[in-house]
A protein has these predicted regions:
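Short, low-complexity disordered leader/linker segments with a strong preference
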Residues: 1-31, 326-327
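Short, glycine-/small- and polar/acidic-enriched structural segments
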Residues: 25-163, 186, 201-203
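A bilobed periplasmic-binding-protein/Venus flytrap-type ligand-binding module shared by bacterial periplasmic
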Residues: 47-48, 114-125, 217-236, 287
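Short, solvent-exposed loop/beta-turn-alpha elements that line the ligand-binding surface or hinge
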Residues: 53-59, 131, 207-216, 283-292
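Short, high-confidence coil segments that cap the C-terminus of an alpha-helix
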Residues: 81, 178-179, 302
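Pocket-lining segment of extracytoplasmic ligand-binding domains
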Residues: 89-90, 98, 169-261
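Secondary-structure end/capping motifs
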Residues: 230-305
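Conserved C-terminal helix/tail region of periplasmic/extracytoplasmic solute-binding proteins
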Residues: 296, 300-327
Length: 327
């Protein structure tokens, strides 16, 4: 009997050890330095930021918000930030530099934020831009490439594009003459319409893209992580992804609370404007295969327009971190 008891205890101990062996070691809490570009790209982050400040998350966070994406590129290269929310094409450019301090994309944080705004009648689609002049910013960058792609897909060959250096210049043109046709990013599009009741949203370039792109999406912003940090703190990155997904979801489920935080953190000065603009700002958190499908097709369009816009080539599969957030 004693021998049987000893054997049973030994088997129980062995099973316990095997069960424990299957569980990965729990990674200690990490300190994450997150950099974000001021605007729609950082709107989906505000609920996560507040949760971190309230001590509700496992890891500790330091947040930096800038107005120039090149600052974030420099910070990534120097190892001064671990995770950054940057324009999609900039992520491709940085990846294609093939430096030791490489990056991977972990999610798409912002979809399309470009809107056609005008007071003119009869403008409700890309096709309606035939024979018209459109004012916009971003010559030689993604706004131009995106609009030209949509015009090409619609068979429009006689739309003139007039470029201005700042969105505020385009907004001023609309204020002076509401019959002008403009393409503006959020939140400038919402601000222009709030300030001038004669203006209206004619159509969303993002929705127009979805209708003709065959599965890709118009991607404004992505979240990248330094590979070195990902290798050292894989569980912390997964926890960030889960928290970011929750934060983006809350932007939809609690728009008022999110708008309050957007104003609190200085992304948009006035809370009512933030509340009105938020649903139009493409806040999202696409991960895994959905992220890759959305982003790859978009970068291919940019590559065909100007290879330099994505760093000379469409990034290979190593660009995409395909793990999905775990709750």
């Amino acid at each position: 009997m004693k021998r049987i008891i000893v054997i049973l205890l030994a088997l129980l101990l062995l099973l316990t050890c095997l069960a424990c062996a299957k569980k990965p070691a729990q990674e200690a809490a990490a300190a994450l330095r997150v950099g974000a570009l001021k605007g729609p790209t950082s709107m989906g982050l505000v609920n996560l930021r507040k949760a971190a400040e309230n001590g509700e998350l496992t890891d500790t966070y330091t947040f930096t918000m800038v107005t120039d994406a090149s600052e974030l590129a420099a910070s990534l290269a120097a190892g001064d930030v671990d995770i950054a929310l940057i324009p999609a094409n900039l992520a491709a450019v940085l990846y294609n530099k093939k430096t030791e301090k490489g990056i991977e994309v972990i999610d798409v944080n912002t979809l399309g934020v470009l809107y056609c705004v005008t007071g003119a009648e009869g403008i409700s689609s890309v096709q309606d831009l035939a024979g018209k002049t459109v004012y916009l910013t971003g010559q030689g960058t993604t706004p131009e490439y995106s609009l030209r792609y949509l015009l090409d897909q619609a068979g429009v060959t006689d739309c003139a594009l007039e470029f201005k250096s700042e969105a505020t210049e385009v907004a001023a043109l609309l204020a002076a003459d509401p019959s002008c046709i403009a393409v503006l990013p959020q939140p400038f599009a919402t601000v222009a319409m709030v300030q001038n009741g004669d203006l209206k949203e004619a159509f969303s370039l993002s929705e127009s893209w979805d209708a003709v792109s065959g599965g890709s999406r118009m991607v404004t912003g992505v979240t990248v992580v330094r590979k070195a940090f990902l290798q050292e703190h894989p569980q912390a990155v997964e926890r960030f992804l889960a928290a970011h997904a929750d934060s983006a979801a809350k932007a939809a489920s609690d728009a008022a609370g999110t708008a309050k935080l957007i104003a609190e953190y200085g992304i948009i000065e006035k809370e009512p404007v933030a509340l009105k603009a938020l649903p139009k700002c493409g806040v999202s958190c696409l991960t895994g295969a959905e992220m890759e499908s959305a982003l790859k097709g978009y970068l291919e369009v940019l590559f065909r327009a100007d290879p330099a816009s994505v760093g000379g080539e469409v990034p290979d599969s190593g660009f995409y971190h395909l793990s999905s957030p775990q709750g």
